Amino acid sequence: MSYEKLLERFLTYVKINTRSNPNSTQTPTTQSQVDFALTVLKPEMEAIGLKDVHYLPSNGYLVGTLPATSDRLCHKIGFISHMDTADFNAENITPQIVDYKGGDIELGDSGYILSPKDFPNLNNYHGQTLITTDGKTLLGADDKSGIAEIMTAMEYLASHPEIEHCEIRVGFGPDEEIGIGADKFDVKDFDVDFAYTVDGGPLGELQYETFSAAGLELTFEGRNVHPGTAKNQMINALQLAMDFHSQLPENERPEQTDGYQGFYHLYDLSGTVDQAKSSYIIRDFEEVNFLKRKHLAQDIADNMNEALQSERVKVKLYDQYYNMKKVIEKDMTPINIAKEVMEELDIKPIIEPIRGGTDGSKISFMGIPTPNLFAGGENMHGRFEFVSLQTMEKAVDVILGIVAKD
């Protein structure tokens, strides 16, 4: 089904810079997310008929309720998307609207080309309306497509009271892209039986498995002396960092893994001879493998310290989130409903693990099972990001189908 305001809504949202900041200690981490919630989303939620629309300064969530139109026994369902965008330029986003007929797409005057040679997924979108970047920023479909889809679905339901449904809760949260958005999620305030994050990618994605995730921060303490007299005296902290990295499995990196394979990812390395620091993320799906990965990292550090006869490798290892499959597989109702709705809409459900995490990972372990629905974005987190309007429309269809089906 086509929805009159969906595209307009989406374009309005993405033009607002809501990039999160991993170095901030505020909640949300950027004021722009607060402003987006209070000056754009909150008035719109109230205007389309949501009730008890309120912003929670304690966690940065904007929450609203669509009252039930039926007194039949059914589940209270929630829909959640995040307001922040990823770590890429989000200032002066200028979307392009392209009626795609195949071939390359010039991204404004940036000199960058969105080409099916580099991104074969473009070939799935012949004849569709694509929204792309101008090559200078990301787009922000992750996850403003999800926000636009939820908002459009709620507007449709509010204007069609003949559609019977139970109470629906909507939540728009901060800081998902830096992994802390759901840390302070208020389960009592949201109060649903189960929920969906609308934060997935291509048409049909339906996900209830995520990585289990840990962060690993290492500090290497060296000893700097003049290199001309360094023999048996210098301890090069940068070399220690390299030695640590070389002892991790060479083929267990993001660029060499897929499917259910886990990895170690070195994403930051800096330092001098005197001191160096490296930062990793550790990811795996199975609990036993996740534990093995963490133990290996600790063992390497311990063995290096033993060989050096002092604690020159300092380890900070901490869990970030866990595979939500452990919670959701206890009651597959939200998956079964979404799968059935997609099939009725001639959408093939793509039930695959998320090689990442969503806010739903943490929310599920807080007591609200929260799988993930497709929102349409492709090539997310960079200048080659795009989304299909037709996929966004089908995401709205699925949301409407879920609340009517239950």
UniProtKB/Swiss-Prot annotation:
Q: Which GO terms describe its molecular function?
A: metallopeptidase activity; tripeptide aminopeptidase activity; zinc ion binding
Active-site residues?
Answer: D84, E176 (proton acceptor)
Can you quote the record's cofactor note?
A: Binds 2 Zn(2+) ions per subunit.
Q: Which reaction does it catalyse?
A: Release of the N-terminal residue from a tripeptide
| Cellular component, GO annotation | cytosol
**Enzyme Commission number(s) of this protein:** 3.4.11.4
Q: Which UniProt keywords apply?
A: Aminopeptidase, Cytoplasm, Hydrolase, Metal-binding, Metalloprotease, Protease, Zinc
Query: Which residues of the sequence carry a binding annotation for Zn(2+) 1?
Result: H82, D142, D199
Q: List localization entries.
A: Cytoplasm
What InterPro entries is this protein classified in?
Answer: ArgE/DapE_CS (IPR001261), Bact_exopeptidase_dim_dom (IPR036264), Peptidase_M20 (IPR002933), Peptidase_M20_dimer (IPR011650), Peptidase_M20B (IPR010161)
Q: Which cofactor does it need?
A: Zn(2+)
Protein's UniProt keywords contain Hydrolase: yes
Question: Which GO terms are recorded in the biological process aspect for this UniProt protein?
Answer: peptide catabolic process; proteolysis
Q: If you read the UniProt record, what top EC class would you report for this enzyme, in one word?
A: hydrolase
Q: Which residues bind Zn(2+) 2?
A: D142, E177, H381
Q: What does this protein do?
A: Cleaves the N-terminal amino acid of tripeptides.
Task: State the family it belongs to.
Answer: Belongs to the peptidase M20B family.
Matches recorded under HAMAP family: Aminopeptidase_M20
Protein name per UniProt: Peptidase T
Protein species of origin: Streptococcus agalactiae serotype III (strain NEM316)
Q: Which gene encodes it?
A: pepT
